[in-house]
Design a protein with these regions (language model features):
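N-terminal secretory signal peptides that target proteins for export/translocation
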Residues: 1-7
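General secretory precursor processing signal
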Residues: 10, 54, 367, 463-466
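Bacterial N-terminal signal peptides
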Residues: 10-23
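Aromatic- and Gly/Pro-enriched helix-to-coil junctions and flexible linker segments
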Residues: 26-185, 189-193, 264-270
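Processing junctions and N-termini across compartments
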Residues: 45-48, 216, 454-457
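Activation corresponds to long, low-complexity, non-globular regions
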Residues: 120-146, 158, 162, 434-475, ...
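His-enriched metal-coordination microenvironments in redox/metal-binding proteins
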Residues: 142-431, 445, 449, 457-462
């Protein structure tokens, strides 16, 4: 999960700072030309929904965008960053391409074309304030907003680390810590936050200036009979969890695919990457869990499918390269999320499903290693794929001087965990379904979405046929050589 290098300049937050600020003039109080777009009626609601989660006092972003006075100086920068399209640097950071594949996701903060156009017109027409009576009530940011998962049922603190002000990047293991859980519990959400001793708002322009953890790969497991844990040897009660990395938000698991936190487990941080930020910094992570009700057992089991490859051959001084990885689904599968993971040359990833003669592009997304995103599908649009489907991911790479993320495009690049190496992975969540569960899921979807034989639906090749026909087609496909 490493980056190209660990220095502060390589860890830029996708900020709105472009060096351009609209001048503050009385023209801002006038009516907007060509449509009367105003801050109070048109712009404030957009910012509240899609921006203020980060752009607020004590938020991760470098400036607050709550009031008119805070927003107006950044109007032209906001216009530029919201109109970039699904690629690195766009605001809000959401890179799903809207012209292809599934378009129904949970917690989607992206802007519509109409909203992007409104922002542009507002910035170009003098940034009028508008009637204060049109201003929506301000969002409240109380203690509960500190955790996207709501009030956690369990918070575990990792051991403290100390990073010198100027030092090389550090990779290694951090001491494990007991969770204190005395009974098996299923987890429906997990969220990780870094806590450090940096002064508030210091280093706001860069991730490196605000944090020392670039990422942490971790799992939970039960100690062996000698009360010891070998990080290299997963044992009883081992559960893997989403990697904590720069920009990652909370992870929510479908209730029927909740993850098990065994009694007496420890958190095992088996691969951490720390970087210096210009100040000696003491830091630790808080790992928060949200539990399912006691006694709950999830309906589905996690899929064993891993989608990625280590066979990467990224040529020097060349843009528009592709890398591919395939996996065959051993069971009927529901894909809950799509999470591209590349490294510095990575620009974009697509995922497609191959079922017989059908090839469907499920999604394409731009990629920004400064702000890694996962995309959780809405329940009624998560891909439902029959056993034997081939999942194919395509990574689009740029190892040329035009890609400023690459430290030296004259070098050939291969696969690996460290900064100078690369990855091609989909880290999205999947669950396996029995034949009965598969048919049940498709039946519910047919009913809720009013699907017919003439309906085209992406990600569910058998949703528009009868249950008997779906079973027959699955059997026929599996019998083919």
């Amino acid at each position: 999960m490493a980056w190209k290098r660990g220095c502060r300049s390589s860890l830029l937050v996708p900020t709105l700072v472009l060096g351009l600020m609209v001048s503050v003039t009385e023209a801002g109080q006038s009516a907007a030309a060509g449509g009367d777009i105003t801050f109070t009626r048109d712009i404030a609601p957009i910012l509240q929904r899609s921006c203020q989660k980060c752009h607020r006092p004590d938020g991760v972003a470098p400036m607050s965008l709550i009031t008119y006075e805070e927003v107006r100086p950044w109007a032209r920068a906001i216009k530029t960053r919201t109109s970039m399209g699904p690629r690195a640097g766009v605001m809000p950071p959401w890179y799903i391409e809207k012209t292809i594949g599934i378009q129904h996701f949970k917690n989607d903060p992206s802007l519509s074309d109409d909203e992007t156009a409104k922002i542009a017109r507002w910035a170009d027409s003098g940034t009028p304030r508008g009637d204060l009576a049109h201003l929506p009530p301000a969002r409240t940011w109380d203690d509960s907003s500190k955790w996207a998962i709501g009030t956690p049922d369990l918070i575990v603190k990792t051991p403290q680390v100390v990073m010198k002000a100027v030092a090389p990047d550090w990779w290694g293991e951090i001491e494990s810590v007991a969770t204190g859980v005395t009974e098996d519990r299923y987890v429906t959400a997990v969220e990780v936050k870094e806590v450090n001793d940096l002064p508030a708002r210091s280093g706001a322009g860069t991730v490196g200036g605000r944090y020392v953890f670039h990422h942490l790969v971790w799992n939970t497991r039960v100690p062996d009979d000698n009360a010891s844990i070998d990080p290299a040897a997963p044992g009883e009660g081992t559960t893997t969890w989403p990697v904590h990395e720069v920009g990652r938000e909370a992870d929510f698991f479908d209730l029927d695919s909740a993850r098990l936190l065994k009694a007496n487990t420890h958190i095992v941080p088996d691969s951490a990457h720390l970087h210096a930020n210009g100040r000696e910094t003491k830091a630790h992570l808080l790992i928060a869990f949200k539990f399912a009700p006691k006694g709950f057992v999830p309906k589905y089991k996690r899929s064993p499918v891993q989608l990625g490859t280590t066979e990467l051959d990224i040529r020097a001084m060349e843009a528009n390269q592709q890398a591919h990885a395939y996996a065959v689904l051993p069971e009927h599968t529901k894909i809950l999320s799509f999470e591209p993971h590349l490294h510095a040359p990575g620009m974009r990833m697509c995922m497609e499903a191959i079922w017989g003669a059908q090839i469907q592009t499920l999604n394409c997304a731009g990629y920004d290693h400064s702000w890694v995103r996962g995309y959780n599908y809405d329940d009624d649009h998560a891909p439902l794929l029959p056993k034997g489907t081939i999942i194919h991911i395509i990574g689009y790479m740029d190892n040329s001087p035009t890609n400023k993320n690459v430290p030296d495009p004259r070098n050939w690049q291969g696969s690996g965990n460290r900064s100078v190496a690369n990855m091609l992975l989909d880290l999205g969540n999947k669950v396996s379904l029995t034949e009965e569960q598969f048919q049940e899921e498709m039946a519910k979807r047919r009913e809720r979405l009013k699907l017919t034989r003439n309906t085209f639906t992406v990600g569910c090749p058998l949703c528009t046929v009868s249950a008997a026909s779906a079973t027959r087609k699955t059997q026929q496909q599996q019998q083919q050589p």
